[in-house]
A protein has these predicted regions:
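N-terminal, intrinsically disordered charge-dense segments
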Residues: 2-3, 21
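His/Glu-rich zincin catalytic helix
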Residues: 10, 18-101, 205, 218-324
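A common structural junction motif
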Residues: 141-152, 250-258
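Structured segments of extracytoplasmic/periplasmic soluble domains
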Residues: 80-83, 101, 145-150, 168, ...
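M16 family metallopeptidases and their MPP-like homologs
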Residues: 46-48, 54-74, 91-145, 181-207, ...
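Short, polar/flexible loop-turn hinges at active-site or ligand-entry regions and domain interfaces
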Residues: 84-88, 128-132, 149-158
Length: 337
């Protein structure tokens, strides 16, 4: 609607816009198909079949509750597993094996979604039809080797590898303050969600990292394999049934408990008093971060409308914040939502 020759968007109007976009997309379906199934106890595969790309993508995610006691351990674990296995004990041999797989790549994943921490790996590789031999299955076998047969010394991760990766994670934690924009947003979340899981940083806290040892991390690794729900994501040209068959075979060594650690996000619908926090640093540009609670989670039917509302408000160079606060009023260097 319009007021004083300016356009204002209400939440119902944005929801209606989102529904119209969904209808348009439904009318223009292409050859992309997605499929989700439980291939092993507590292991779920989402496969998106498409022949549009020459490179296939895959990710393996262990889902853990976002808690202070294990956030740092979950963040440290993938990088240590990627440092060596029984048959490929160092970075050089791992790189050589990936070169043999037509330049495939394997990297670590540490993400936070709501009150859930995801830790694992992602892979990129050439699609099978572009080479003379299968690539997806051997890449998955190599990933399983790194995951299930890590290099060990005296019943624990090698001390030198552990200390090296622990220092890398420590440096990452200490360097968070160097990016003042993301640091301000992180401090906002920490203040808003004090005492809640969502307030914990994605890679954990440095004091919890310092308590870890090579032996305690290996014990955590064993428990993580057994008790975590696992989400697998595949994008490529193979049929979902073939992908599932390959993964059932390569992940057959995954130990499974009778019950898995529950994960989820609790909405925060109750009103809260307004909080204000400030921090003084030696900077030339101040940062102002504003946070608002809603009761909408990613599974809510209203979530796409909320995302669209944030985009209209501050999602780019045509947003209300950018055009008004930055361009017209010249009050800041950047403004976004």
């Amino acid at each position: 609607m319009r007021r004083n020759n300016k356009r204002y968007f209400t939440f119902p109007a944005l929801y209606g816009m989102m529904e119209r976009v969904k209808n348009i997309n439904a009318q223009n379906k292409d050859d992309t198909m997605d499929h989700r199934t439980e291939i092993l106890p507590g292991v779920y595969l989402t496969a998106v079949q498409s022949d549009k790309f020459k490179t296939g993508c895959f990710s393996l995610n262990f889902l853990r509750p976002m808690c202070k006691e294990e956030a740092a351990a979950n963040a440290l674990l993938p990088s240590i597993l990627l440092r060596g296995s029984k048959d490929h004990p160092d970075i050089a041999s791992i790189s050589a094996r990936l070169d043999e797989l037509y330049g495939a790549s394997i990297g670590t994943l540490i993400r936070k979604k709501g009150e859930v921490q995801l830790t694992g790996f992602y892979c990129d590789y050439v699609q099978d039809e572009y080479v003379e031999e299968p690539v997806f299955a051997p890449v998955m076998e190599f990933l399983a080797e790194l995951l299930f047969a890590p290099r060990l010394e005296n019943g624990a991760f090698p001390e030198a590898v552990f200390e090296s990766e622990k220092q890398n994670l420590r440096n990452a934690m200490l360097s968070r303050i160097n990016d003042k924009r993301s640091y301000a947003n992180a401090q906002l979340i920490r203040a808003m969600c004090q005492g809640q899981s969502f307030g914990i940083p994605r890679i954990g806290e440095i004091e919890d990292l310092e308590h870890l040892t090579a032996k305690s991390l290996y014990a955590h690794y064993q428990a993580l394999l057994e008790t975590s729900r696992v989400e697998l994501f595949y994008m490529g040209s193979l049929a979902p049934e073939k992908v599932a068959a390959v993964l059932r075979k390569t992940l057959s060594r995954l130990p499974r408990a009778k019950e898995f650690t529950p994960v989820g996000t609790t909405p925060n619908p109750a009103p809260r008093p307004v909080q204000e926090r400030s921090e003084t640093l030696d900077v030339t540009q101040g940062k102002l971060s504003l946070g608002f609670f809603t009761d909408i989670t990613a599974n809510d039917a209203r979530y796409p409308a909320l995302v669209l509302a944030a985009t209209v408000f501050g999602g780019g160079a045509t947003s209300k914040l950018f055009l008004n606060v930055r361009e017209q009023m010249s009050l800041c260097y950047y403004a976004s939502a």
